[in-house]
Amino acid sequence: SHTMNVDVSEYIYPHEFAQELMDACGPMLPHALYDRFSDEGRTILMESFAENNAWHIRAAKYMIDKYDDWGLFYTHLHGIDLVEHWYINQAFEGAHEKWRENLETIYQMYEICDTFVAAMLPYLADGETAFFITSDHGQVPRSAGYHNPGISDLSGISCKVMSDLGYTVAHPVPNMDDVWYIDWSKTKAIQARSSYIYINLKGRDPEGIVEPEDYKELVQQIISDLYAYRDPEHGKRVVAFAMTMEEARSLGVGGEHTGDIFFQLNPDFGEEHAMAPSYVTNNGFSLISLCLMCGAGLKKGEFIKRQIKAVDVVPTICALCDVRIPANCEGGVIYQALEGFSEKEY
């Protein structure tokens, strides 16, 4: 379970608003996770998420009602993401003895979030408010009987595959289960976060050992080895594709914190999301994001057939509010969703 120090105002900005929000809405109760496959653990988890969601409703309504000069209200509900991480690999036939219960728990989390949506819908009655519901990703499970072989962890450095290939040298930390330390003096590259491999480059990285003149050749060798790597249990290729960072820019991947190699996995071995492109499906689940729009200035009952990207949401909100689109915005207005727009005229 998680806890929150209610005396620390840094959770809230502006900081002086923290006590006001606490007095009006009470503390935000985080979720409680333990023994998630037991009936008791599952019940407590869902009850805690319902409490958390109820706080979000109270806080949202308090701020919207009291500060009626607001122009944009944004909130983030993370429960669906968390619950799918915990259950989706065991939520289809053949994956777990309680797969039906696990799938129902996922649906229950959606129903909890639906109560937040229901609480916000009355604000559309003024005819001047629009409501956007979006997600940054979906999730897909690994195939039944498959396990990730040690690459593409969402939150840290994955050593197993890169150690097998000879690029990362890691040693177990004494008296700590499944905790390793890296010998940087012998490590040419590491796999960090979901989809990146970083070369331990001399002159760039604190303990770099790879000479700059060897960089390109090493990158190509690692890519070749990733394609050749086979899961030891099933004999299948683990990596779907890998490319240099220059090549990855064609996919919209880039920036100073990205790795030297970008790769994605075959969904059999995935880590729920961030390890495969958006249109990948597996076992009836998809990585495609959600986009629902309703309210002032928007069409009613329409299904938009054009491709919509997450970066298109902000320009569309700007168009509805008749404000300038940010100078470096990468997306475009979803004109097909706007009231009065007709494709036949074009």
Where in this protein do the model-derived segments appear?
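His/Asp/Glu-rich, glycine-adjacent segments
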Residues: 1-96, 195-208, 214-217, 221-236
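Extended hydrophobic/aromatic segments used for targeting, binding, or gating
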Residues: 72, 85-123
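Metal-dependent active-site segment of extracytoplasmic phospho-/sulfohydrolases and closely related
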Residues: 110-156, 237-246, 254-255, 259-267, ...
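Acidic, His- and aromatic-enriched active-site or binding-groove loops in soluble protein domains
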Residues: 1-21, 94-107, 152-174
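Short secondary-structure boundary/capping segments
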Residues: 88-94, 146-161, 214, 259
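Active-site neighborhoods of enzymes that stabilize oxyanions during catalysis
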Residues: 165, 170-316
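Acidic/histidine-rich catalytic neighborhood
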Residues: 118, 122-204, 340-346
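Long, internal low-complexity/basic segments
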Residues: 307, 313, 318, 323, ...
